[in-house]
C-alpha cells in the first residue's frame, strides 16, 4: 500500500502537473471540448442568448418561448449586456467562446488569489471536474464563482470600489425575475 502511495505521489510531483501553463491549457481545452460536444444540447446557452435578443427586441424576458428553448428565463436585463458578445455570433462560435471565456474567467480569478502557487494549482486541479460539469450545462455559475473570487481579491487589495462593482454586477446579473 505504501509503495502505491509513494508511486502515485512521485507521478503527480512531476513538473507537468504543477505547471500553471498545463492547467491553463487544460481549462481552455475543457471549455472547447464541452462546447464542441454540446452544439445541439445547450438549452441554458439558448436561454442566455435569447435574453439578449428579447431585450434587444423589447419582448418580455420571463415568458415561455418553447420554439426557442425548453425552460423559462430567470436572469435580469443586465445579463443581456453580459451575453451580448456571444449572442450575436453564429451559434457554434458563440457557444465555444462562451465556454472558453467562462473557464478563463474562473482560472484567472483563482490565479489571482493571494496564496502560494502550489495551493492555486491544487484548487485548479480540484475544481477542473466541477468546471467541466458546469460547462456541460453552459451554466453561468462559473462566472458567479469567478466574480466572488475576484471580489475577495479586490477586497484583499483594499480596492473596495472595484470589489463592490463585482458584487453588484453578480447580484444584478443573477437577479431572478
Regions found by a protein language model. Name each.
Residues 161-177:
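Membrane-interface alpha helices of multi-pass inner-membrane proteins
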Residues 94-95, 122, 145, 160-164:
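Alpha-helical transmembrane segments and their helix-entry boundary regions
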Residues 150-162:
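Membrane-interface transmembrane helices that cradle and orient dolichyl/undecaprenyl
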Residues 8-110, 114, 130-133:
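TM-lumen/periplasm interface segments of multi-pass membrane proteins
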Residues 100, 126-127, 150, 165-169:
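Residue-level signature of the transmembrane alpha-helical core
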Residues 118-135, 145:
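Transmembrane and membrane-interface helices of multi-pass
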Residues 140-149:
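Hydrophobic core segments of transmembrane alpha-helices in multi-pass, intramembrane catalytic enzymes
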Amino acid at each position: 500500500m505504501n509503495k502505491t502511495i509513494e508511486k502515485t505521489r512521485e507521478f503527480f510531483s512531476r513538473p507537468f502537473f504543477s505547471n500553471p501553463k498545463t492547467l491553463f491549457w487544460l481549462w481552455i481545452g475543457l471549455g472547447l471540448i464541452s462546447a464542441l460536444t454540446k452544439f445541439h444540447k445547450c438549452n441554458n446557452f439558448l436561454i442566455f442568448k435569447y435574453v439578449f435578443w428579447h431585450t434587444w427586441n423589447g419582448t418580455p424576458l420571463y415568458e415561455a418561448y418553447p420554439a426557442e428553448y425548453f425552460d423559462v428565463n430567470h436572469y435580469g436585463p443586465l445579463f443581456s449586456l453580459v451575453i451580448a458578445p456571444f449572442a450575436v455570433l453564429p451559434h457554434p462560435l458563440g457557444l465555444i467562446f462562451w465556454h472558453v471565456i467562462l473557464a478563463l474567467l474562473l482560472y484567472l480569478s483563482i490565479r489571482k488569489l493571494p496564496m502560494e502557487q502550489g495551493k492555486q494549482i491544487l484548487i485548479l486541479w480540484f475544481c477542473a471536474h466541477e468546471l467541466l460539469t458546469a460547462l456541460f450545462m453552459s451554466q453561468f455559475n462559473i462566472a458567479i464563482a469567478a466574480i466572488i473570487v475576484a471580489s475577495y481579491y479586490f477586497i484583499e487589495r483594499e480596492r473596495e470600489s472595484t470589489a463592490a462593482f463585482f458584487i453588484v454586477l453578480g447580484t444584478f446579473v443573477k437577479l431572478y425575475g
